[in-house]
Design a protein with these regions (language model features):
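A general structural signal for well-ordered alpha-helical segments in protein cores
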Residues: 9-10, 67-68, 166-171, 194-198
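A short glycine-threonine-serine/GTX helix/turn-capping micro-motif
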Residues: 55-61, 155-164
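Glycine-/small-residue-rich active-site loops that bind phosphorylated ligands and cofactors
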Residues: 5, 117, 192
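Predominantly a Rossmann-like dinucleotide-binding segment in NAD(P)-dependent oxidoreductases
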Residues: 4-84, 88-91
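Active-site loop of classical SDR/Rossmann-like NAD(P)-dependent oxidoreductases
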Residues: 138, 157-171, 185
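Contiguous beta-strand/loop segments that form the cofactor/metal-binding neighborhood of enzyme cores
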Residues: 62, 68-143, 170-181
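C-terminal helix-rich "cap/oligomerization" subdomain common to oxidoreductases
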Residues: 105, 172-204
Length: 204
């Protein structure tokens, strides 16, 4: 599921951060909001993603891992996390609205908000990185243009996905098996994501 790490879009985000285009990173914010789907309104045929006995939780369990994995890939492991959860819409049993705050091992603070029962006007898919010399904004699922703002003005970057989005990760694994490179996307690197999510949900 963490193939996004290797996509050109997110590689460009990392390159912009590492190049110092926004200076020293001061804060990370995840914001995600979508309206409920038509199936969410059905009591009889609810999506498996909101059946806790199958998915373990709601849409947060399905979507947030991608976001959390990316920011940990960029800034290191999160060592503290806490969250507040609620079911505001009442369409299904698991939580549908969450707020969280967390801290990376280097002291960098961050926060996140997720709402899966928002009005269409509130729809959002963004991660904003604030630095002392600028800011960077990008999406995780919609691949909106990457926006860089600093003293040089505003720039937008468009990075097209390969036809098969898992291909860059697969290539990295093949290169690893052939001894040509090291693929860091393994179960060990993925485990901290589950820990962060459990902390946000108050399960640990």
């Amino acid at each position: 599921a963490y193939y996004r790490r290797y996509l050109p879009y997110f590689q460009r985000v990392k390159q912009l951060i590492n190049s110092g285009s926004i200076g020293r990173v001061m804060n990370v914010q995840i914001r995600f909001a979508v309206p409920p789907s038509d199936l969410d309104h059905s009591r009889k045929d609810q999506p498996w993603r909101v059946q806790a006995n199958i998915a373990g939780g709601g849409y947060f369990y399905d979507l947030a891992p991608h976001q959390i994995d990316l920011i940990q890939e960029m800034f290191g492991p999160i060592i503290e996390a806490t969250g507040y959860t609620s079911n505001r819409g009442g369409y299904y049993q698991p939580e549908d609205t969450l707020s969280a705050c967390f801290q990376f091992n280097g002291g960098l603070p961050g926060s996140g908000s997720w709402c899966f029962v928002a009005h269409e006007s509130a729809r959002e898919d963004s991660i904003e990185i604030t630095g002392d010399k600028g800011k960077l904004k990008f999406s995780v699922f919609t691949y909106e243009p990457i926006i860089l703002q600093n003293s040089q003005g505003r720039q937008e970057f468009n990075e097209a996905n390969p036809r098969h989005v898992q291909l860059p990760l697969i290539q990295s694994i093949v290169d690893h098996l052939r001894g040509e490179n090291v693929c860091n996307c393994d179960s060990i690197s993925a485990t901290p994501v589950n820990w962060v999510m459990d902390r946000i949900l108050g399960k640990t």
